[in-house]
């Protein structure tokens, strides 16, 4: 009987009956998760591949801080980059956060850096991070939708990037 009621409710939503079908979900907003400064070693050129010119940049450390978490970027990881025929650079960074309470979280952050077209201003670099956190205090990271920004600090004294991550609410 429970299954019949659930199917009837689902049918009403699909066919437009009931309040659930008429109410649109609220637009998502963004909440700051953290801002990080990630330090880097010089790029290592791999060379031409069938997909484009490949390089990687070792991640050597850094820090992150936000309202719910803070800690360090562990000195292991890399930023794989691929220059493609359209002039863009595809990036996939794979690295680890270590929170101030000792939890290690994997981050795989991907995006694209593309040159401006037709005299337009440069497009801001946006990334799509995915987290893999152990069960416990930070497991909520495994189930969210996130967007990041990638930039540079002109005052930096060593090679680094500034990555700010937001959670969709």
Model regions and ranges:
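Bacterial N-terminal signal peptides that target proteins for export
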Residues: 1-7
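Beta-strand-enriched cores of mature, soluble protein domains
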Residues: 21-169
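Cleavable N-terminal signal peptides
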Residues: 8-9, 19
């Amino acid at each position: 009987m429970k299954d019949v009621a659930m199917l009837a409710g689902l049918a009403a939503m699909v066919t437009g009956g009931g309040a659930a079908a008429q109410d649109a979900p609220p637009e998502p907003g963004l909440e700051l998760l953290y801002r990080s400064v990630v330090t880097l070693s010089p790029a290592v050129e791999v060379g031409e591949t069938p997909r484009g010119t490949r390089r990687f940049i070792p991640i050597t450390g850094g820090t992150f801080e936000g309202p719910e978490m803070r800690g360090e970027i562990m000195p292991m990881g890399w930023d794989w980059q691929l220059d493609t025929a359209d002039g863009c650079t595809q990036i996939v960074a794979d690295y680890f956060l270590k929170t101030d309470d000792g939890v290690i979280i994997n981050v795989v952050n991907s995006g694209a850096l593309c040159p401006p077209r037709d005299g337009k201003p440069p497009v801001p670099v946006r990334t799509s991070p995915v987290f893999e956190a152990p069960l416990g205090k930070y497991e909520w990271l495994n189930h969210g939708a996130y967007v990041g920004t990638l930039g540079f600090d002109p005052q930096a004294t060593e090679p680094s990037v500034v990555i700010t991550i937001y959670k969709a609410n």
